[in-house]
Amino acid sequence: TLQALDEEYAPIFAGHSDKIYLNEKLYQRIKTIDASKLQGEDKRLLEYYKQNFEIAGANLSSADKEKLKVVNKELATLSTQYSNKLLEARKKGALIIDDVKELDGLSPDEIANAAADAKTAGYSGKYLLALQNTTQQPLLQNLKNRNTREKLFKASWNRAEKGDENDTRATLEKEARLRLQKAQLLGKKSFADWKLQDQMAKTPEAVEAIFSKL
């Protein structure tokens, strides 16, 4: 499947990226370019690549680079596993409704689509409310049956926390630990600090300040 291929190749692509950005000879070639002789786009391009190399870890010792390569491959694998688990959890978390009365408030087209989806999934005569890739489900605003709304909300909210093969909690915990390890290897106190350094906000504190004004 595409998901299996994604999991197989994600760490390979991560390793390929590291071979570029953690390449000492390539980084030194960039550093030897005299920025004072450049102008405009040429100067900005040099700054851009130099910054990208340094953010990726080009200044690390050889030993720390090797540690970072291992972490990056593990993160690539975990990130792909998380996405695949979430995709399967969304598919399997669909809500099956027996009685059309429970769909009061939905349009005729929405009800017809739910019936067709149920038939395709092997539930002829019933109705399937597929989960969307958001926490809040669009159908909630129109459904009038409180019990149906509650079931749909819980199906969405708990889709990846059922203790089955698609439960994402352990994957997220591992990813969080590795992100912290990566940030610390790169001289930052948190992954957010590392991730934001070349963004407009620059720091987690600045992001929080922006959110507080919304």
Identify what each model region corresponds to.
Residues L2-Q197, A201-K202:
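His/Asp/Glu-rich acidic catalytic environments and adjacent acidic regulatory segments
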